[in-house]
Amino acid sequence: MSDTTELVDLAVIFPDLEIELKYACADNITGKAIYQQARCLLHKDAITALAKSISIAQLSGLQLVIYDAYRPQQAQAMLWQACPDPQYVVDVTVGSNHSRGTAIDLTLRDEHGNILDMGAGFDEMHERSHAYHPSVPPAAQRNRLLLNAIMTGGGCFVGISSEWWHFELPQAASYPLLADQFSCFISPGTQHVS
């Protein structure tokens, strides 16, 4: 594993960016807070890409809302314990792109302050969360397309098919896994990953 000198704090770089870290509260697949600290970190190589996406969103009168970025390996182990399905959660032995600092989870807020309906919530691990699932109503499909265009419009991020909210750098998996940057709450049965 590599050190974490490649990570930057999004709250410092983008002070107006809305950050709602879902794993720092109970609003996630585990039903409990995982992160002991609400730190939103991302690999320095993704900062230019995110800046482009923020600008594209603003042109549309929208705002990005960040749900997750860098994720400690210990947190990944807890997510795997809650949902051991490789279609939705990467086994900690493989290593998540979040644990490389190269992936980000997010949604959109409109000019009236409303989160756009995406047809399925964050961390809903079922087919309706897939990027273009036919059961998602047309209005929510359009919102997903809008999010996808904002994130991929600068040619800097790519999405994945199983989660409408997840975007990552191209070749994200080629980056090294990073040492845990902050602590997580330990749940029974979760082993610390070094």
Name each region found by the language model.
Residues M1-A69, Q81-S194:
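Extracytoplasmic cell-surface/polysaccharide-interacting catalytic and binding patches
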Residues P72:
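Segments that shape or occlude catalytic/ligand-binding pockets
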